């Protein structure tokens, strides 16, 4: 409670409104901004969001008269309702302008002698419920063997809209609604164009099994447990990294580079998520970035400008307090790799650590990105360990037992702690397509590469239409044909589709 009240403005009316609705001003401002987007005056000047009073979220009659647009609260945030069964959306859901509505009524009216548009559709509470992972807070007993909230139990799956980013749809419909009813024109305002673009494209790869059989422990396990031929192991060890059966990185980086070159600089990023040794049975094989094999992989990744992040182990997923330790180890190993790559670490006078003139290396060593192994990001409050560690971007937002949009959006959103209703600085990046789910026929119902390709193209088109961030998650070992016959081929076909359909070639 203290963290919330510290963020409440000192204005007496806003303070009263806060205690009545129990939603802080900065959180409300963020949610309105998420739905409406940047606003401009007719002369082209951008209107700061903190001064944007076109839309009010209130049921106070006096407040309503002072606004041009009012979204009427449904009571979701009230103290006697929030966190209780009475706050859950009731199925079947009503629809507002063709979009499932979690809270409120799908209707509007003009009040205040036609000067105020009153929306009874509570888009604020509906959006909050989805992007804050609210139901994971209230359904603590529903977890799988890795501590994950099952997608099959989620409202989007039960209500049948998991394949739709309905928060993005709320935004598109609301913006159209404001323009159609002349609200913006009467106020001398314009909205920034939205949709029909990718804000970013993230090509992400988890390095879970980068090699076939390397390291003393893995060699003994391969010989005595998997019954590998010792001479075959020796031949692979004595060959170059590219001859390892699990070395799929050249083809991955080549495909990623083709998409990177098809868009303006900075629009597309290739990202590798790497873990540190943990001892957990699911975190095998263990590897270190400082080994010659991993060094070769990172040196090739650096050539295409790939960025790096921490793949939190299954151990730290179960014990989040270990995340800072893993991040520290990974950062130290990555520093050693860069020292070998560039020979750049030089102790600065009166400084206790090293610096790099190259800005990319410095940013990489900050390691502000993370993903959890098997997407096993447990309770919503576990996210605070990421924040404490210095992580500012997490890429774990998808279900492992369902395709679709876990947060109800294709856009990155700031994490909201549903326990405290606190708006944080951690950005949650929804995964648009996850190869590990696509290959599970029982979940995806995709029986061939062509079926999967058509589905993936539909998702890509949908994210583009909503103006979202397209994030692909393709584990590197899945490119090995022995692991799966066509998921690697699907990735290359999909990237080719993205480049040819949406690529914006830079002028030569």
Language-model-derived ranges and their functions:
Residues 223-229, 289-310, 336-340, 390-400:
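Acidic, His- and aromatic-enriched active-site or binding-groove loops in soluble protein domains
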Residues 249-257, 291-303, 326, 378-388, ...:
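Histidine/acidic residue-rich metal-binding segments in metalloenzymes
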Residues 205, 274, 310-313, 368-375, ...:
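Short His-Asn-centered micro-motif
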Residues 2-289, 348-357, 400, 407-412, ...:
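Terminal accessory/targeting
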Residues 319-327, 379-385, 405-410, 482-492:
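Histidine/acidic-residue-rich catalytic or RNA/ligand-binding cores of hydrolases
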Residues 372, 376-385, 390-392, 396-409, ...:
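A structural motif corresponding to the C-terminal lobe/cap of the Radical SAM core domain
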Residues 271-273, 284-334:
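Acidic, glycine-rich loop-and-beta core segments that form the ion-binding/anion-interacting portion
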Residues 257-264, 321-380, 384-385, 391-393, ...:
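CE4/NodB-like, metal-dependent polysaccharide N-deacetylase domain
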């Amino acid at each position: 409670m203290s963290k919330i009240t510290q963020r409440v403005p000192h204005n007496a009316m806003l303070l009263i409104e806060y205690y009545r609705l129990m939603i802080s001003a900065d959180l409300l401002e963020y949610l309105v901004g998420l739905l409406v987007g940047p606003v401009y005056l007719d002369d082209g000047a951008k209107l700061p969001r903190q001064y944007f009073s076109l839309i009010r979220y209130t049921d106070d009659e006096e407040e309503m008269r002072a606004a041009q647009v009012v979204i009427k609260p449904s009571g979701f945030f009230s103290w006697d309702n929030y966190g209780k069964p009475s706050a859950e959306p009731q199925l079947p859901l009503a629809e507002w302008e063709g979009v499932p509505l979690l809270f409120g009524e799908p209707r509007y009216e003009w009040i205040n002698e036609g000067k105020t548009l009153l929306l009874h559709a509570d888009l604020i509470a509906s959006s909050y419920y989805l992007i804050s992972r609210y139901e994971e807070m209230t359904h603590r007993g529903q977890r799988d063997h890795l501590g994950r909230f099952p997608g099959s139990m989620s409202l989007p799956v039960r209500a049948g809209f998991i394949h739709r980013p309905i928060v993005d749809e709320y935004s598109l419909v609301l913006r159209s609604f404001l323009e159609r009813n002349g609200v913006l024109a009467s106020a001398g305002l314009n909205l920034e164009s939205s949709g029909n673009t990718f804000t970013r494209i993230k090509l992400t790869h988890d390095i879970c099994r980068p090699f076939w059989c390397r390291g003393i422990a893995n060699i003994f396990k391969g010989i005595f447990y998997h019954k590998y031929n010792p001479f075959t192991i020796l031949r692979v060890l004595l060959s170059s990294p590219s001859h390892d059966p699990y070395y799929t990185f050249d083809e991955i980086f080549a495909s990623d580079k083709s998409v990177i070159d098809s868009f303006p600089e900075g629009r597309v990023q290739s990202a590798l998520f790497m873990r540190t040794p943990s001892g957990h049975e699911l975190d095998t094989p263990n590897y270190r970035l400082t080994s010659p094999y991993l060094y070769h992989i990172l040196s090739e990744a650096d050539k295409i400008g790939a960025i790096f992040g921490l793949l939190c182990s299954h151990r730290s997923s179960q014990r989040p307090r270990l995340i800072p330790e893993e991040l520290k180890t990974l950062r130290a190993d990555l520093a050693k790799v860069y020292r070998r790559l560039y020979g750049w670490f030089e102790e600065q006078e009166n400084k206790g650590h090293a610096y790099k003139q190259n800005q990319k290396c410095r940013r990489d060593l900050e390691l502000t990105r993370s993903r959890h192994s098997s997407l096993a990001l447990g309770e919503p409050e576990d996210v605070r360990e990421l924040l404490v560690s210095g992580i500012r971007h997490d890429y774990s937002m998808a279900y492992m037992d369902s395709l679709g949009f876990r947060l109800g959006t294709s856009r990155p959103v700031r994490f909201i702690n549903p326990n405290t209703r606190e708006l944080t600085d951690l950005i949650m990046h929804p995964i648009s397509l996850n190869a590990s789910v696509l290959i599970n026929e029982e979940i995806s119902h995709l029986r061939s590469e062509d079926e999967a390709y058509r589905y993936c193209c539909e998702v890509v088109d949908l994210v583009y239409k909503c103006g979202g961030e397209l994030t692909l998650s393709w584990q590197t070992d899945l490119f090995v044909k022995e692991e799966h016959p066509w998921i690697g081929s699907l990735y290359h076909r999909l990237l080719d589709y993205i480049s040819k359909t949406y690529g914006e070639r830079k002028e030569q």
